Amino acid sequence: MGGISCSTPKQHQSIPNAVSRTKGKIVMDGTKGRIPVVPYVKPALSSFKSIYASDLKVKRSFPSMEKALQIDSVWMSSFTLPKELIQARFGTRLPSWSGYMEVAHADSGPYDVSEVKFLPFINLDPTNLSCIYTALNFASDQCRKQQLKTCFVTFDQPLFMKATEISTGCPELKQVVPVNHKSYMYNSSDIYVTCCIGEIMSGSGLEDLFATVYAKNSVPQIMSGHSYARAMRAHSLAQQALGVIILKNEIVADSTILAELSSLHQKLMGGEVSCEETRPVACKIRKLYQDKCLELSALNRTAKLWIEYLNQFELVRLFTRAMRCGDWQLYLDSMKAMLPYFHAAAHLPYAKAVHIHLQKMEALEEEMDPFEFENFTR
């Protein structure tokens, strides 16, 4: 098993025997670059018996999600502007969602540069319980040396469940918090969500829509989420097209909103206003979009299905934004909103792992040192 250490800010911690990046072939001699294996004796009674799935914190409103969706509505509605107006004011084509978010969140606040270091290897199969136990002990030792009260160790889904079982039954590892790697890394979670979207929307005609842009043989890979980049691009194009259809008549018919949107978009792209300053106009557009979606959903089941599709992909965007901007509350809220779709698509092992992960993350505020929690979530 290999691993990496991520520290923020850079040079905040030093890892003894860290493996430096080199060119060419690496030759390991003896115990250099390796962690001594600590055998793990599995107890007769599984530690999972002491883990109870409790209800997650329920909120009546999600301010972090609503603010993000308002900015998304401004981006989506910008494509409803008349072509002549776009060419006159912006010259080139409008940016994609990623480009728009990069400009909109350019002043999101101060940040620190992180450092990634390669850790020594554990010469065991990663699925071996002794290997996971050794990794947790190594992380715990490094945590104590850095005088940190809490240490986060990330694993992929199968290893996360094993690490959770081990850490729960070992009092000496109480400061170590196993983290579901696929819940904490945005591309992996997005793969699962896009897979859920593909399964839920199977047979709806979405495949035929994608086939107009992508090769027919690549569409199944897009629907399953295995072709991640294509899936994100395809869903983004579909959302953009549907959003324009929903909003175009409403915005063009209202000259006041059209003028406000055009002016706001120009200022936002020019860096003249911040996200907070776009709030009044963004709220209007978001409400207009929501009202129109409710109106269309009431017409028939087909319209309701496609509106639900838009809502599903909005969650993908929210989660991506949370990871890129380091928005802790948006991260938790978007993950909670994804849970029903994991169950609907019968991804039960992943739904179980995400629920346990969220349960642990919600408990951090009470269990962690206040200073460490503030630095971790800011």
Where are the predicted features?
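Buried hydrophobic core signal strongest for RNase H-like alpha/beta domains in large
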Residues: M1-R378
